[in-house]
């Protein structure tokens, strides 16, 4: 805990926050340090809030690993249904991409093992 009462170990890196903020704004827009700090605090707290809820679900089910479904359930439980819908689409696309990558890797590996 710092002198100002904040735990900086649980904050997202300010450079990452600023980069995401800039990507959502017009090219010539400026962002104050105060705005970056405020968003950094908010998104870090939001992640902790959702993760805590997802962790409770895991604990109830005697599991140790939080899954994408746990995060979706946490978002719905906490009243963030709109975010859950968008995240579900992203999670599906991510899993499809992972499956394609695994399939391509498997195909490449089996071809390299074939006798020539």
Swiss-Prot record:
A Gene Ontology cellular component where this protein is annotated is:
chromatin
InterPro entries in the cross-refs: CBFA_NFYB_domain (IPR003958), Histone-fold (IPR009072), Transc_fact_NFYB/HAP3 (IPR027113), Transcrpt_fac_NFYB/HAP3_CS (IPR003956)
Is Transcription given among the entry's keywords? Answer: yes
Q: Which GO terms describe its biological process?
A: positive regulation of transcription by RNA polymerase II; regulation of transcription by RNA polymerase II
Residues in the DNA-binding region annotation: 12-18
Q: Among its keywords, does the record have DNA-binding?
A: yes
Q: Which GO terms describe its molecular function?
A: DNA-binding transcription activator activity, RNA polymerase II-specific; DNA-binding transcription factor activity, RNA polymerase II-specific; protein heterodimerization activity; sequence-specific DNA binding
Which residues lie within the region annotated Subunit association domain (SAD)?
39-50
Keywords, A to Z, come to:
Activator, DNA-binding, Nucleus, Transcription, Transcription regulation
The protein's location, in the record's own words, is: Nucleus
**Family the UniProt entry places it in:** Belongs to the NFYB/HAP3 subunit family.
What exactly does this protein do? Belongs to a complex that binds to the sequence CCAAT located upstream of genes involved in mitochondrial electron transport.
Provide the assembly information.
Belongs to a heterotrimeric CCAAT-binding complex.
User: Can you say what this protein is called?
Assistant: Transcriptional activator hap3
This protein's gene is called hap3
